[in-house]
Amino acid sequence: MLSLKKYLTEGLLQFTILLSLIGVRVDVDTYLTSQLPPLREIILGPSSAYTQTQFHNLRNTLDGYGIHPKSIDLDNYFTARRLLSQVRALDRFQVPTTEVNAWLVHRDPEGSVSGSQPNSGLALESSSGLQDVTGPDNGVRESETEQGFGEDLEDLGAVAPPVSGDLTKEDIDLIDILWRQDIDLGAGREVFDYSHRQKEQDVDKELQDGREREDTWSGEGAEALARDLLVDGETGESFPAQFPADVSSIPEAVPSESESPALQNSLLSPLLTGTESPFDLEQQWQDLMSIMEMQAMEVNTSASEILYNAPPGDPLSTNYSLAPNTPINQNVSLHQASLGGCSQDFSLFSPEVESLPVASSSTLLPLVPSNSTSLNSTFGSTNLAGLFFPSQLNGTANDTSGPELPDPLGGLLDEAMLDEISLMDLAIEEGFNPVQASQLEEEFDSDSGLSLDSSHSPSSLSSSEGSSSSSSSSSSSSASSSASSSFSEEGAVGYSSDSETLDLEEAEGAVGYQPEYSKFCRMSYQDPSQLSCLPYLEHVGHNHTYNMAPSALDSADLPPPSTLKKGSKEKQADFLDKQMSRDEHRARAMKIPFTNDKIINLPVEEFNELLSKYQLSEAQLSLIRDIRRRGKNKMAAQNCRKRKLDTILNLERDVEDLQRDKARLLREKVEFLRSLRQMKQKVQSLYQEVFGRLRDEHGRPYSPSQYALQYAGDGSVLLIPRTMADQQARRQERKPKDRRK
């Protein structure tokens, strides 16, 4: 403090006190150059602006730093964390959680509320108005205990601190402050409230009892309903399939709880079951988002009305309503239209659907699953393109096509592609006759693939459209087979063999290259005009009249045969000129009367006679001599190279012969060594046998360590001491060494 007194004068202190009384906070730390703690920290204590705060661990104060729960900097920290979490949450979708603060204003006395009296509790606002949330069975709950009513309020989010007569106002304020701090830190009241945990345990017991009741009910009619209800793997909810299995079996399979108005008037009835609590707002938000996603799909309401004529009181007709038709705006290529086999995971069809009657007023039905007479109920086919062509596309309906089944996979098609298909169906119905249909089928069966402009009628189709219309107009084939045929025929678009080839000397021909792209299957993403720069397409003539008769071709366009022959001869001459050497060009320029072959290859006598027959100038004679000299040198060089090549080839053959001899000798050596080893083994066995039979005067065998056998020159065998045998062996080893020296 002594070092600070020389900086802080009396006037400065008075001025600082005056500003602090006014409310202005002065920071004089910038004027101080000492290493002591700043003035603000001395007066007000440490702050997060001047200390290293551990933002990830506020309660850890082992290193001397941290934020106190009652510090003024705590609000700034939570604000920064909240903003940071909002920024991080921008890249993912979050369903907002609704918190409803409900306060009990008036409550009837116990026992006065009946089950039939309308509940005066809370109501949630939905798209259809105010609907009761508690349901008809909450009246009985209200007549039980006060604790049960409070539990219902806690489920709605109206959680207030418990008020008791023993707590003072200061205690209530302190509890409220601590509770809000816990919420800011991420811990809700359900962590500390015992009654809330008890409530969750009771709810779990009720759900378990409901599951047991459902198991007993499923033994009677659950098999019929299981074919029509699909269970979500994440939430466990049951929702109806797009095609009801049997109309008569549905009312029997519905439980008795469907008569309650809570299921019919619930906020999210299409996806809520009878056992779920309507107070779970977070679950209701998730169900609402799933309903919005289902409404974005292409669903035909007319088919649902025809296929399922339910009574007015049927809960399936009231709860599971189909969404209206909406445009399909997803940009998905048709190359991805083929899906994997889904025989077990995607049970969309049932055998009862195949037998449902459909209207047959139209002659050419669009390609939808309802037009097929051999639908595969297990989806064994891997090509599901037949499901992607409903007649009602983007609001353009075909009234004569008959009722259709709802298409859950219609969202996978491009909108522009669907417009083209719908216009194609209209063109078929307006001006397409059976004769044109037969012609079109013949063109499909041709080996040359699909041809463009094959018919000049107003209803003629292009290659890609024709293949799609043929598959969509067949009402006798299955959806999978027709779809696979349509896409298999698309691959034939490209080249046509109907164009005639010209009988040219260079085998030049006109190739029927398709100038426009295919709408479905593009064979190449390059511009056809870029192919003209390729060298091997230099002589290719693009003739796009290959669909016409051969007699209709204009003969004036073909050049006369004489010009063709002249052109071919000129090309041959140019080719020969390119192959000529420099001496040949010089001889032609000097007008030499004979060829270079005669100049080079004729013998000396014949060459002199040839020169004497013609009157040649000195320049011609010198050129002829140079050509002969260079030719002879060239021939000599060729002969030299030939001799060298022959020598190299002879050496190569000799080396190969030596390698073969070496391999043969190595094989013989191996055989000799093997035979020698066998002989040594036989001699050793014989030596042991003979030595084992020898006995001394007393009839005892000789010791192998003291005696050894020695073969004599005459074939006899001698028994000598081991020392003498070793000396003789060493002497025999020294003799070859002395010879080498």
From Swiss-Prot:
InterPro entries: bZIP, bZIP_Maf, NFE2-like, TF_DNA-bd_sf. Residues 623-686 form the bZIP domain. A motif (Destruction motif) lies at residues 447-451. Residues 350-354 are annotated as: CPD. Residues 198-216, 567-582 have a biased composition (Basic and acidic residues). One of its GO terms (biological process) is glial cell fate commitment. Glycans are attached at residues 319, 331, 394. It comes from the Eukaryota. Residues 108-148, 198-220, 441-501, 551-582, 722-741 are annotated as: Disordered. A motif (Nuclear localization signal) lies at residues 730-737. Residues 732-741 have a biased composition (Basic residues). GO terms for cellular component: cytosol; endoplasmic reticulum; endoplasmic reticulum membrane; nucleoplasm; nucleus; protein-containing complex. The keyword Ribosomal protein does not apply. GO terms for molecular function: cholesterol binding; chromatin binding; DNA-binding transcription activator activity, RNA polymerase II-specific; identical protein binding; promoter-specific chromatin binding; protein domain specific binding; protein-containing complex binding; RNA polymerase II cis-regulatory region sequence-specific DNA binding. Belongs to the bZIP family. CNC subfamily. Interacts with KEAP1. The cholesterol recognition/amino acid consensus (CRAC) region directly binds cholesterol, as well as campesterol and 27-hydroxycholesterol. Has much lower affinity for epicholesterol. This is Endoplasmic reticulum membrane sensor NFE2L1. It comes from Mus musculus.
